[in-house]
């Protein structure tokens, strides 16, 4: 018997049965309890979702921007009214502490929808004079039907981040959440419908990567926005391009450097490093997992980090005092433990954690102790590869040039940060770091106004910020001739 029963698809403004005959299960990562059995979409279901999205999108795009804005604002109100109930659902599905899901996941998702609701009326074209009797004007028009493919670490937030600019610009979206955390996207779909979004404008199809592939290759879809791992992102991008030259946005992985200079406030630096590695049990794509510390202050910094790690409150996600929960799945647990074993084998010095937690109520959950490695080298797997778990690698450096060169020596380029009291050094270093999101003397905040995305193999395009609206519209250029037409022949 599951907690939430059988979960279906959401197509054309209502829950709908899948035709595949297949289901998959989703579990509470803190207890192992079966949360729900979820129907998996078939190719026919994806076709049905695309057809309803096309129909709904025509109605949605025909509305005025102000009408769309008001409907999206109503969705924001509903999200905020139901914050606690949605936070509990997200807690059960992801394993995150309730204190975190109440304060972050739904709140930040609603903020992004509110932000784009305010920008819906600001989408406009240009007028360009050519001659006294001729001019050009441009229109920004919606793309049509877009697909969003989400990751398992921030299910409802990602659904909001992807759908908000798409809908604000007059598009429809078919969203596929991760099969690891599939539940909250259905609640967002219900809220959009209740707020007045036309049927079909936000559909949810459930399933594994095969469903994502169907969306990526579907000729009726104009754009794919994907959040997840690099290798999967490459496959999505390949399918999107080969099928119909779709627009793509890719928010992919990272192995982000945090550089602590010798003039830094070390208490502040330790606070930043612990947050940048252990928030959401380390399951954040922007985490600063490569912590470069200038040699002169390394020992003092490590002492402060370990003192803070010792204060982390690992516990039941439902306990309001807990600030560190389990990993999202058994597969992720195995992956993280494998990397920890690799760090030990390659000679990194284990300073904290380094094992699965199995005592008391942890035994049935996917808990790994917050782990800190010292004396790390750039060639170690724990330093080179994305772990997506609570594993911090501390490395030392001597000079600024050395730190920048080593920080940039990666295929990733999602985020980076520096901690220093020297403002000139801070900006100089940030300007040289090859990353799309950078922080100075802080870490991790991604407000709606701030574009989010990576360099190199960490992504293509951006989410959030005004610039993202450009990626959900296409430009039509129109020349108007007021005078006599001059024939060529």
UniProtKB/Swiss-Prot annotation:
Q: Report the active site residues.
A: 162 (charge relay system), 251 (proton acceptor), 285 (nucleophile), 463 (charge relay system)
Keyword list, A-Z: Metal-binding, NAD, NADP, Oxidation, Oxidoreductase, Potassium
Q: Which residues bind K(+) 1?
A: 26, 93, 180
Q: Which domain of life is it from?
A: Bacteria
Q: Where does NAD(+) bind?
A: 150-152, 176-179, 229-232, 253, 285, 386
Positions of K(+) 2 binding = 245, 456, 459
- State the EC number(s): 1.2.1.8
Q: Where is coiled-coil annotated?
A: none
Per the record, the pathway is:
Amine and polyamine biosynthesis; betaine biosynthesis via choline pathway; betaine from betaine aldehyde: step 1/1
Where is the PTM Cysteine sulfenic acid (-SOH) found along the chain?
285
CDD domains cross-referenced by the UniProt entry = ALDH_F9_TMBADH
Q: Where is this site: Seems to be a necessary countercharge to the potassium cations?
A: 247
Q: Which molecular function terms from Gene Ontology are attached? A: betaine-aldehyde dehydrogenase (NAD+) activity; metal ion binding
Task: Show the catalytic activity.
Answer: betaine aldehyde + NAD(+) + H2O = glycine betaine + NADH + 2 H(+)
Cofactor(s) recorded for this entry are: K(+)
Name the GO terms of the biological process aspect.
glycine betaine biosynthetic process from choline
Family assignment from sequence similarity: Belongs to the aldehyde dehydrogenase family.
Q: What biological function has been recorded for the protein in this entry?
A: Involved in the biosynthesis of the osmoprotectant glycine betaine. Catalyzes the irreversible oxidation of betaine aldehyde to the corresponding acid.
Name the PANTHER family on file. Answer: ALDEHYDE DEHYDROGENASE-RELATED (PTHR11699)
The UniProt subunit note reads as follows: Dimer of dimers.
The protein here is known as: Betaine aldehyde dehydrogenase
């Amino acid at each position: 018997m599951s907690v939430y029963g059988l979960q279906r698809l959401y197509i054309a403004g209502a829950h709908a049965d899948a035709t595949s005959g297949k289901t998959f299960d989703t579990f509470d990562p803190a207890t192992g309890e079966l949360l729900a059995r979820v129907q998996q979409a078939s190719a026919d279901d994806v076709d049905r979702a695309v057809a309803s999205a096309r129909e709904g999108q025509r109605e949605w795009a025909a509305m005025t921007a102000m009408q769309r804005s008001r409907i999206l604002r109503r969705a924001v109100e509903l999200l905020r009214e139901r914050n606690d109930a949605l936070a509990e659902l997200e807690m059960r599905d992801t394993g995150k502490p309730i204190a975190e899901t109440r304060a972050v996941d739904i709140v930040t998702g609603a903020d992004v929808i509110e932000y784009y609701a305010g920008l819906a009326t600001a989408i406009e074209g240009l007028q360009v004079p050519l001659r006294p009797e001729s001019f050009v004007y441009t229109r920004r028009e919606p793309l049509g039907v877009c697909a969003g493919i989400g990751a398992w670490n921030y299910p409802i937030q990602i659904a909001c981040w992807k759908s908000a600019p798409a809908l604000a610009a007059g598009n429809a979206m078919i969203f596929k959440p991760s099969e690891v955390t599939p539940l909250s996207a259905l609640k967002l779909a219900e809220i959009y419908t209740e707020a007045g979004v036309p049927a079909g404008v936000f559909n949810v199809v459930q399933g594994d990567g095969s469903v994502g592939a169907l969306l990526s290759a579907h000729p009726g879809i104009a754009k794919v926005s994907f959040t997840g791992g690099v290798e999967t992102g490459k496959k999505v991008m390949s399918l999107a391009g080969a099928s119909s030259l779709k627009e793509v946005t890719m928010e992919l992985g990272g192995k982000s450097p945090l550089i602590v200079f010798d003039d830094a406030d070390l208490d502040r630096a330790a606070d930043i490093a612990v947050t940048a590695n252990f928030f959401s049990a380390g399951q954040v794509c922007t985490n600063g997992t490569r912590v470069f510390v200038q040699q002169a202050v390394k020992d003092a910094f490590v002492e402060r980090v370990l003192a803070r790690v010792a204060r982390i409150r690992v516990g039941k996600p439902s306990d309001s005092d807990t600030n560190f929960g389990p990993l999202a799945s058994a597969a992720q647990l195995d992956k993280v433990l494998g990397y920890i074993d690799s760090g030990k084998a390659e000679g990194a010095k284990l300073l904290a954690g380094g094992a699965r937690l199995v005592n008391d109520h942890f035994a049935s959950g996917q808990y790994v102790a917050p782990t800190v490695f010292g004396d790390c080298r750039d060639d170690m797997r724990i330093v080179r590869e994305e772990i997506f778990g609570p594993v911090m690698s501390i490395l030392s450096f001597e000079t600024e040039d050395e730190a920048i060169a080593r920080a940039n020596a990666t295929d990733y380029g999602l985020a980076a940060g520096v901690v220093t009291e020297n403002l000139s050094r801070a900006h100089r270093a940030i300007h040289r770091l090859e990353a799309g999101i950078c922080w100075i003397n802080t870490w991790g905040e991604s407000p709606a106004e701030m574009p989010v995305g990576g360099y190199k193999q960490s992504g293509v395009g951006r989410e959030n910020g005004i610039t993202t609206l450009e990626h959900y519209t296409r430009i039509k250029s129109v020349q108007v001739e007021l005078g006599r037409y001059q024939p060529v022949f």
